A protein has these predicted regions:
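Short active-site loop/helix that positions an aromatic residue
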Residues: 76-86
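Active-site-proximal loop/hinge segments that shape catalytic or ion-binding/gating pockets
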Residues: 171-183
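Long, compositionally biased stretches
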Residues: 1-67, 87-163, 169
Length: 183
């Protein structure tokens, strides 16, 4: 299918790459169809782009690449709703917020929303943004990476314990959370 975007022009996206978010995302409840694309210049960063709204694109990353101790505990009922049957069946993303430097020449600051990861069933390609029940995480965890390069070093978030999706063990994948940069 052809998808018009403000930031990237017209893109050709295979139908099997479209992910369905039955309840949309917080703040974008009417947006249900999204796809992932790589960010040029940094393999750690991706774009979660709406298939229907040309201007809606969120900067996302794999939270496990950025925060080694991150262990989100996704409620069993949400895992069941999405069709996630095991840890290898989940893709987890964190939404990144990129803020311009305060002064000319100052690099941007980047934060990750670890409180509300985006969880996607790899098999069914259905997803949801999940607000975690524990108080361990917040919406602004500082990330140390450069937009044009790979991660320079990680920032720990002090999480303890093993995370799980549907009670099946720790989850790996791509991070998610707060809604950030729109195109």
């Amino acid at each position: 299918m052809q998808v018009d975007t403000v930031r990237f022009g017209t893109l050709s996206v295979d139908d099997d790459k479209i992910m369905l978010f039955p309840k949309g995302l917080p703040g974008f409840e009417d947006e249900r169809r999204f796809f992932l694309m790589d960010h040029a210049g940094n393999s750690k960063i991706k774009w979660l782009h709406s298939a229907d709204s040309p201007e809606l694109a969120l900067v996302v990353a794999d939270p496990f690449d950025l925060f080694e101790e991150y262990r989100p505990d996704v409620p069993d009922e949400i895992a069941r709703e999405l069709g996630i049957t095991g840890p290898d069946g989940a893709l987890v993303l964190t939404v990144l917020t990129v803020r311009a430097g305060q002064h000319e020449g100052e690099p941007p600051t980047i934060s990750a929303n670890l409180l509300a990861p985006i969880v996607i069933s790899k098999e069914r390609r259905t997803g949801a943004q999940v607000v975690l029940r524990s108080g361990e995480y917040g919406v602004r965890h500082q990330v140390h990476l450069r937009l044009g390069e790979g991660v320079k070093h990680t920032a720990g978030c002090g999480a303890g314990g093993m995370g799980s999706v549907g009670g099946v063990g720790s989850v790996g994948g791509v991070c998610s959370e707060e809604t950030v940069a729109t195109a």
